[in-house]
Regions:
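Short, hydrophobic/glycine-enriched beta-strand segments
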Residues: 16-26
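Glycine-rich phosphate/diphosphate-binding loops that line cofactor/substrate pockets in enzymes
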Residues: 9-18, 44-48
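Acidic/glycine-enriched connector segments
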Residues: 1-5, 27-169
Length: 169
């Protein structure tokens, strides 16, 4: 039993260098705009890689490219290592016509992504809802928060970015 506890603690501590960045941004509200949001995502990713973290991202709308660019800037300019040591991209599978099957697949996918990490950071978290023709809190980000919380991840919402991140904070 003590050995099992020790192994669990080792696993927990080793995952603290694996950081999941959750977020999407269809829209930006003051004081945020597209440029500032991308700069935040880029600088955050770069700082994490600089500190020897491995970033996992689902390539969220409006933020994914900035996360990649921030990580790659440091990998190429400072680390001279394989990209996989610092960056893991997990874009969500698309073109699943059955909404129930898509929801099930995405939940399983989120669980597998978050299971590999020890810290979850939440930025923005909004999406366009065609039914209401408005921008709403991204339910996927909320689901990722619930999964991360259940798995015991350290949760870091950047509430000032609004939407899901604000709800989580």
């Amino acid at each position: 039993n003590e050995i099992t506890d020790i192994l669990r603690e080792i696993e927990r501590v080793s995952k603290l260098h694996n950081v999941f960045i959750s977020g999407s941004a269809h829209e930006y509200t003051a004081p945020w705009n597209k440029q500032r949001a991308e700069e935040l995502a880029r600088k955050l990713a770069g700082a994490l890689v600089h500190e020897e973290c491995r970033i996992t991202s689902g390539f969220g709308l409006g933020l994914g490219s900035a996360i990649i660019n921030g990580a790659l800037d440091i990998i190429y300019n400072e680390k001279y290592r394989h990209i996989d040591e610092h960056l893991c991209l997990r874009p969500f599978p698309q073109n699943i016509p059955d909404p129930d099957e898509r929801a099930k697949r995405w939940k399983e996918y989120r669980e597998s992504i978050i299971d590999e990490t020890g810290i979850s950071i939440f930025l923005f978290g909004n999406k366009y809802d065609a039914a209401t023709e408005s921008t709403v809190v991204a339910d996927g980000c909320i689901q990722e928060f619930e999964i991360a919380k259940a798995k015991g991840n350290l949760i870091i919402p950047i509430g000032s970015t609004g939407y899901a991140a604000k709800v989580i904070s």
